[in-house]
């Protein structure tokens, strides 16, 4: 299993005091976790099966497990989202999940690149085998989380129209920017595969991520807003 895509079930859920303090400092000041103390971007994808949010704090994760019975967490950011540097937010999440008895899985995606075929197929396998209900999250819960939510819908027989609804302003997704390549992916399936091939068969045999990457042209002003002010990963 590749780096950044591991399933975690730590035998010792406790972080040493100094390491925990350092993780919190990194999470709050480097990962902007202070925004997520009050803002959660929490939504149901399929009630009782899949939920979505921004990256939850350990305390919020505990509340979600208690209220919704979350059994699996899928972290779409990857194990080391900052140029190979370990994330304090991830360390806290791993420890919290282990303490709560919840499976924690890394399944990284990009917010501004054409979705990779191998990552889509791996996520499909995770969805097939995971304990439900599950929570998917990235940093803000807008772009990669919207993609993963749409993939869940298509994998389970839903339409591209329903998948696209998971990428909207409602979740703070800006399609007229570089992150609009995720919308373009669903539109591509709608135009070239839907009604003719099951979604995963289309992904495995016909989807050309390089062609999508070359063809996609993001907006200008909105792209700048998204990439600089919102600091998309």
Where are these regions (language model features)?
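Cys-dependent protein tyrosine phosphatase-like superfamily
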Residues: 1-134, 147-233
């Amino acid at each position: 299993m590749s780096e950044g895509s591991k399933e975690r079930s730590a035998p010792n859920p406790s972080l040493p005091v100094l390491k925990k303090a350092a993780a919190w400092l990194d999470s709050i000041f480097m990962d902007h976790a202070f925004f997520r103390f009050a803002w959660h971007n929490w939504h149901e994808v399929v009630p009782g099966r899949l939920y979505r949010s921004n990256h939850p704090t350990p305390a919020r994760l505990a509340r979600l497990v208690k209220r919704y019975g979350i059994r699996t967490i899928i972290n779409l950011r990857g194990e080391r989202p900052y140029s190979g540097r370990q994330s304090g937010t991830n360390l806290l999440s791993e420890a919290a999940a282990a303490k709560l008895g919840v499976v924690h899985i890394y399944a990284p995606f990009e917010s501004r690149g054409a979705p990779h075929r191998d990552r889509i197929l791996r996520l499909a396998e995770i969805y097939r085998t995971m304990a439900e209900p599950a929570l998917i999250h990235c940093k803000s819960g807008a772009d990669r989380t919207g993609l993963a939510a749409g993939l869940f819908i298509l994998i389970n027989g839903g339409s591209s129209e329903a998948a696209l609804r998971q990428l909207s302003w409602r979740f703070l997704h800006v399609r007229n920017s570089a992150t609009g390549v995720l919308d373009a992916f669903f539109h591509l399936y709608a135009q070239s595969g839907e009604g003719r091939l099951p979604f995963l068969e289309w992904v495995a045999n016909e989807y050309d991520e390089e062609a999508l990457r070359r063809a996609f042209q993001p907006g200008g002003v909105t792209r700048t807003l998204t990439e600089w002010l919102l600091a998309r990963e």
